[in-house]
C-alpha cells in the first residue's frame, strides 16, 4: 500500500524515512518525493524545514558520497561527474573533494593493485589497457603515468 503524499506531515515523514536510510541531496530527495506523488509546494516546504533543523545537509551528503565512492575505488574526476549528474553545484563538489581528506594516490594504488595485482605493464598494449581502466575510474592522467612508470606518488 502506498502512502498518499497530500499533506505536509506525510511529505515530511516520507522525506525523513528516506534520510534515515542514507544521506540524500536536495535535488535527489525532491525527485524521489515527486515520484511518490507529492506536489512541488509541499516538497519545498518540507525540505526547507528539514534543512533548517539540520536533518538535510548538502555538505553531509557530499562527504558521505565521496567517502563511499572513493572507498569503492573511484577517483576524483569520476566522483565529480557523478555528483554533477545528481544536480549538485560544481563549486560545492570541488570544495568537498578538496576538503575530504582522501589520499587519491593511495586510492589509485589500491585500485590498480586490486585489478592488476601490482603487475606493471610490459608492453604498450597492456600499458594502454591499464591506463584506460584507471582513467575510467576517474584518476588523473599524470598520477596514472607516474604509477605505471614506477615513479613515486608521494607528491600527491
UniProtKB/Swiss-Prot annotation:
Q: Report the record's Gene Ontology biological process terms.
A: regulation of DNA repair
Q: Which Pfam families match?
A: RecX_HTH1 (PF21982), RecX_HTH2 (PF02631), RecX_HTH3 (PF21981)
InterPro entries associated with the record? RecX_HTH_1st (IPR053926), RecX_HTH_2nd (IPR053924), RecX_HTH_3rd (IPR053925), Regulatory_RecX (IPR003783), WH-like_DNA-bd_sf (IPR036388)
Superkingdom of the source species: Bacteria
| Keyword Ribonucleoprotein annotated | no
An example of a Gene Ontology cellular component annotation for this protein is: cytoplasm
Give compartment(s): Cytoplasm
Record's keyword terms, sorted = Cytoplasm
Q: Tell me which HAMAP family the record gives.
A: RecX
Stated role: Modulates RecA activity.
What family does the entry list?
Belongs to the RecX family.
Protein name per the record: Regulatory protein RecX
The species is: Pseudomonas putida (strain W619)
Classification from the root reads: Bacteria, Pseudomonadati, Pseudomonadota, Gammaproteobacteria, Pseudomonadales
Amino acid at each position: 500500500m502506498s502512502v498518499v503524499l497530500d499533506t505536509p506531515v506525510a511529505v515530511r515523514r516520507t522525506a525523513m524515512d528516506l534520510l534515515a536510510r542514507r544521506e540524500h541531496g536536495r535535488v535527489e530527495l525532491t525527485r524521489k518525493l515527486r515520484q511518490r506523488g507529492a506536489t512541488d509546494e509541499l516538497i519545498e516546504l518540507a525540505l526547507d524545514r528539514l534543512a533548517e533543523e539540520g536533518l538535510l545537509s548538502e555538505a553531509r551528503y557530499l562527504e558521505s558520497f565521496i567517502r563511499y565512492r572513493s572507498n569503492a575505488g573511484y577517483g576524483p574526476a569520476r566522483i565529480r561527474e557523478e555528483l554533477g549528474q545528481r544536480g549538485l553545484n560544481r563549486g560545492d563538489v570541488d570544495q568537498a573533494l578538496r576538503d575530504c581528506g582522501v589520499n587519491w594516490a593511495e586510492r589509485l594504488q589500491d585500485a590498480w593493485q586490486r585489478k592488476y595485482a601490482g603487475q606493471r605493464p610490459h608492453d604498450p598494449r597492456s600499458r594502454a589497457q591499464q591506463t584506460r581502466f584507471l582513467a575510467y575510474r576517474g584518476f588523473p592522467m599524470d598520477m596514472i603515468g607516474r604509477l605505471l612508470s614506477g615513479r613515486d606518488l608521494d607528491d600527491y
